[in-house]
């Protein structure tokens, strides 16, 4: 059976998301926010419509991460733009997950050895904010932490694969 590139990306994305959303998580994840904003996976994409993501939110239910919507291309515009900018700086980056957490969680990520870059998404476009953050980092960041929200920090964990993102999450959970 032969698949087109979009079909292959869709199939691999479904497989990756299935592993991620069925994965048991530490009880501390509930203390983080109770819900993820989303996750995106790309394969040589050049626009947000070519990035597979969960439509709606990913939530923690009974200790498991579950998706509230279907996985489809173009579902998560905001995180798709973040991923596209990260891919321009490092073409190996293909995946990200975004969630909200208390500011202390950022310290835990730094203590775990992850490269964390602090940003404020207020005035600039998403693309410009991500470009500036990456350029100001000592090395390519594992995590972008947006301090703009007064209640919680918006955290974006970047990786080459969903497994890479999960391994970075495991370092702090």
Where are these regions (language model features)?
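Conserved mixed alpha/beta catalytic, RNA-binding, or beta-rich assembly cores of soluble enzyme
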Residues: 3-173
